[in-house]
Amino acid sequence: MLLYGLDTDTSFSRALATELGVGLAPFENRHFEDGEHKLRPLSDPRGQDAYVLHSLYGGSSESPHDKLCQLLMFMATLREHGCARVSAVVPYLAYARKDRQTKPFDPVTLRYIAQLFEAVGIAQIFVLEAHNVAAFQNAFRCPTFHIEAHSAFEAMVSEGLIEQAVAVASPDPGGVKRAQLWRESLVLTLGRPVGFAMVDKRRSAGLVSSDNLVAGDVNGMTVLLLDDLIASGDTMRRAAVALRGAGARQVLAFAAHGLFVGSAAEVLCDESIGQVIITDSVSPFRLPTDHALRKRLRVVSAAPLFAQALRASHAAWRR
C-alpha cells in the first residue's frame, strides 16, 4: 500500500498513516513562479495499490480549485507510471452541496466533479459524511465508500451521557435520514430508548426561515444536533434556539466538517449551544486561537474510520 498525503496541514494524513501502520509515501510538489505546480511520486509506484489523501476545503493559501487540480493531476500521474490501482481519499468533498438544480440553468456541479475524477482513472473514492449520500453515490460511476461521521462521535456520547435522557435531532428536513441512522446506532450502543426530533427550515432566495417549529419531544433531554457541516453556523444556532424553546435540557452541536466561515465563531457562541463537536476532516484554522468558541470546541479524529475502510479495501485487492 502507498499512502500519499497532499494536504499542506499534514495532521490528518499523519494520523491516518499511524492508524494504518505505514509511512507516508514521498512526493514532490514543485511550485513555479507563474503559479503552476508539478507533482510527482519520489518512489516507484508501478504495480502498487495507492491511496491519495486530499481534503478539498478552501484553506488559508489554497482554494478548493487549487486542491482539486493538484489531486487530479497527481492521481493521473500515478496511473501514467503504472500504478495498479489509485483511490481518492477525500474527507471533505468540495461542491457536494450542489447536487441538483434549484434555479433555471443551474449547474449540477457534483456530477461534473465526479466526471473529472473518472477521467483520470481512479478506482474508487472514500468520502466522510457527504451532504446527500444518494446524490454522491449516483454521481460517481466508480465504487464509492461513504463513511458516516456519527461513528466517530459515538464513543464520546456513550461515555459522557450514560445517565441522561438523550435525543438525536436534525436541524432541517434534509438531514433527517442522517439523524435517524445515528439514533438507531445509539439505541444499540446505549441499550435504551433514544428520542428523535427535527427542526423545520425553509430557504428561499438565500433567506432561511424556520419559525422555531420542532417535530418530536425533547423536553428535559440532552439533544445531539447532527449535521454534515457547519459553515456560517446559522442553521445550528436556529435549530438550537428552537430545541431549547421546546424544553431541551442542553443542545450539543455535532458536524463532520467545521468550515466556520464568516461570523460563525460569534454565531456559535450563542447560549443555546452547549458544545460544538466536529471531526478533523477540516482544520479549524478560521477560528482565532483565543476565541471563546475554542473552549467549547471538541475535535474528534476520523482517521480510525478511514483506516478501517482503507485496510479492508487493500486486503480485498490483494486477494
List each model region and its residues.
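PRPP-associated nucleotide enzymes
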Residues: M1-R319
